[in-house]
Amino acid sequence: MALQKFPLLGLLFLITIVVSSTIAVDDPVCPTTSKLSRASFPNGFVFGTATAAFQVEGAINETCRGPALWDIFCKRNPERCSGHNADVAVDFFHRYKEDIQLMKNLNTDAFRLSIAWSRIFPHGRKEKGVSQAGVKFYHDLIDELLKNGIIPFVTVFHWDTPQDLEDEYGGFLSENIVKDFREYADYVFTEYGGKVKNWITFNEPWVFAHAGYDVGKKAPGRCSRYLKGCEDRDGRSGYEAYLVSHNLLNAHAEAVEVFRQKVKGGKIGIAHSPAWFEPHDLKDSNDVPTVSRVLDFMLGWHLDPTTFGDYPQIMKDLLGHRLPKFTSSQKAKLKDSTDFVGLNYYTSTFSNHNEKPDPSTPSWKQDSLVAWEPKNVDHSAIGSQPLTAALPVYAKGFRSLLKYIKDKYANPEIMIMENGYGDKLKDKDSVEVGTADYNRKYYLQRHLLAMNEAICIDKVRVTGYFVWSLLDNFEWQDGYNNRFGLYYVDFKNNLTRYEKESAKYYKDFLGQGVRPSALKKDEL
């Protein structure tokens, strides 16, 4: 109401939110508090929730949105999406104002969203048409966030390649994607860069390349027939994932070049998604080095080029001609092409030296000479895994990973773009069962504490944290069977949202302390 009555004050409020949306904590000072809360973190620390366009928006036939890779993947192979699709998803497209009120209820500062490429360019390229209705939707969404005091963090690409580009030249298998992605990124930076200062070019490039083009678990489902479960699928494991990542990295560099010309005062990064690893046998001299080796293959694969300008040396040594080479000009563009390290952390496991891989059946996991083990040499599991949990819970690994990045990459600014707990409920489970998510509450408590220790004790420069996810949503090959939301979505009854116990905890946690939007500019 105040914004409507006093338009000048409203404008100043929006400007304040935009200006204060690029926040750095160079020398974190951690207050002493009686219990862990927002007040336990440095001034200016940003807390939020996250989603992705394909997973929540729905409305696939509105705004002239073109088909995306996952639309076709799930329709052609419904069994590979658990029989589900994202045609409606959780209907965020129509309910975003309602959902922004849920964000406000949580006391969050920020919201991470993604833009659907084919909602802007239905056919993948500007010359083939721009959907002005799609452009307007994201303007309206961003404006509504700002009006409610919530800082938008925007991901340019979250796995939803326009199907037209996939059909035309194979999407990210072709270097043609580099110029098309640059054009798309240029358009969204120009369109929204005056309002949005925090950007991610690519979400989880390791998962996108490995799961989509090496083991075939995610779209487009490509893998070699010698891999278990890939008998009837096209692809070339051990080759295509490296090519896809190479094109993705060059596309990132081109987009960042445009970004730094167009978005003044902004920050940009990539959201990486490594697990943490502990040696299978601490007394085995072959197992101990597997931690750094597998992290080079999982994290360094994309973080080394954007930091140092080239792939990790171990990848070059082990892959040989199968790893594409950057030109000198590409290296120059890639080096220092991120302003912060985006990190998505979920789980940890054990790493074991794999001494004798079969050279006739290459794959990403085999290439690193590392086997992943659920238990160590003493038959102990890593962390805990409740019965409904999708992944083991190991908060210590979160802190260890943060310290690893600090030490290896010269203490960069880090933003936790995703952290969350998935539980696989049964169809018969009631809303009451779904909202009593005490395991998720415990997960958040442990990981927020681990992050606080990394900041305050290890002096890691973490400046923001986003819970995955605001809402239960479409979880790729798991469909709607794997729930990560702070809010329960009743898929059987009008997609009604219900507050979970974890949401109540996060709201209480964030209710204690000063929000960044309430700080003076010189305090940020």
UniProtKB/Swiss-Prot annotation:
Disulphide linkage map: C223-C230
Signal sequence, renumbered to the chain: 1-24
UniProt xrefs under Gene3D superfamilies: Glycosidases
Main location class: endoplasmic reticulum
Class of enzymatic activity (EC top level): hydrolase
InterPro entries found in the cross-reference section: Glyco_hydro_1, Glyco_hydro_1_N_CS, Glycoside_hydrolase_SF
Tissue: Expressed exclusively in roots.
Motif range (Prevents secretion from ER): 521-524
Induction: Up-regulated by salt, 2,4-D and methyl jasmonate. Down-regulated by cold and mannitol.
Regulation: Activated upon binding to PBP1 or PBP2.
Residue ranges crossing the lipid bilayer per the database entry: none
Subunit structure, interactors included: Component of the PYK10 complex, at least composed of PYK10/BGLU23, BGLU21, BGLU22, JAL22, JAL23, PBP1/JAL30, PBP2/JAL31, JAL32, JAL33, JAL34, JAL35, GLL22 and GLL23.
Name this protein carries in UniProt: Beta-glucosidase 22
Source species: Arabidopsis thaliana
Organism phylogeny: Eukaryota, Viridiplantae, Streptophyta, Embryophyta, Tracheophyta
Gene expressing this chain: BGLU22
